[in-house]
Amino acid sequence: MSQNESLKQLTDSLEGLEKEAANDITLSNDKESLENLRIQLLGKKGRLSKILGSMATLKGSERPLIGQRANLLKNQLQLLITDRLNTLKKKELDELIASERIDVTAPPIGTPFGHRHPLLTTTEHIVDLFCGLGYEVHEGPEIENDFYNFAALNIPEDHPARDMQDTFYLSNNLLLRTHTSPVQIRCLENSAPPVRIVAPGRVYRRDAVDATHSPVFHQVEVLAIDEGLDFSHLRGTVMAFLKAFFGDLPVRFRASYFPFTEPSAEVDVQWRGKWLEVMGCGMVDPSVLEGLGIDPERWSGFAAGLGVERFCMVRHGIDDIRRLYTSDLRFLEQF
């Protein structure tokens, strides 16, 4: 093979590659096959690189001719590949738009409305009833310290509620509140009597999960501080609330004990032929008022608390508290 024949062969190879590559690029029907073709043509081990590797057989004066021709072909092929890629992308987009096109004349598919959770509706109903009695809504943090959760409420250090088996303790003297009573303390710190508040919220206790207990549940507490309040005002408020919520169910008060109220009582309603405890209440202990700088000789008050889950279960005839937390649509769709 002469040097001139080598030059002619390389030139013919470039021309043949140009025609064949242009045809193959046009026939590529997807981006993957186009990318594979690009590698075959222009990759490090592609056909153009192999032709350029044969330039060693040429004279020094002939190599620039083949080099220029090869670079021109490379640029042409890159342009053809880019144009084809853009065409394929546009085709994909057009197909996607066509597949997602909405027929505005088609009848709509109905979307079922969701339901408010029974715990939420029960909480709102309870709060609304007390707001109707002149109470204002107050809320507080779920992470509390020992003072607000225990000490300010006259709960002694040896009280069982402070035990680790009953309370979720965190670091730095913090804990997950075991009741919403700390909201009462925070309110009295910032508001002078008279006050009437209702405090809904989530609370935490280390209870084993069963049909009537959960480590996370919801409470609503009420507090009234004013001049001349006594147990008859407490009883009248509780009775008015229970009648508005349950109707004419029988109600009874039983003497009880809470560290922050004196006297204290538990309230039962008759449900399904049995007495069911639904509230705890009592007159605010004077020592609690004194600790907050409130004169117990002038001011008196009462507090009451209830578990939202129990009210919800009685109201809707639910026999297991766990049903309220399972997110079972078959259950929730009943409300």
UniProtKB/Swiss-Prot annotation:
Its EC number is 6.1.1.20. GO terms for molecular function: ATP binding; magnesium ion binding; phenylalanine-tRNA ligase activity; tRNA binding. The keyword Ion transport does not apply. Keywords: Aminoacyl-tRNA synthetase, ATP-binding, Cytoplasm, Ligase, Magnesium, Metal-binding, Nucleotide-binding, Protein biosynthesis. Mg(2+) binds at E262. Its cofactor is Mg(2+). Its main location: cytoplasm. GO terms for cellular component: cytoplasm. Belongs to the class-II aminoacyl-tRNA synthetase family. Phe-tRNA synthetase alpha subunit type 1 subfamily. This is Phenylalanine--tRNA ligase alpha subunit. It comes from Prochlorococcus marinus (strain SARG / CCMP1375 / SS120). The lineage of its organism: Bacteria, Bacillati, Cyanobacteriota, Cyanophyceae, Synechococcales.
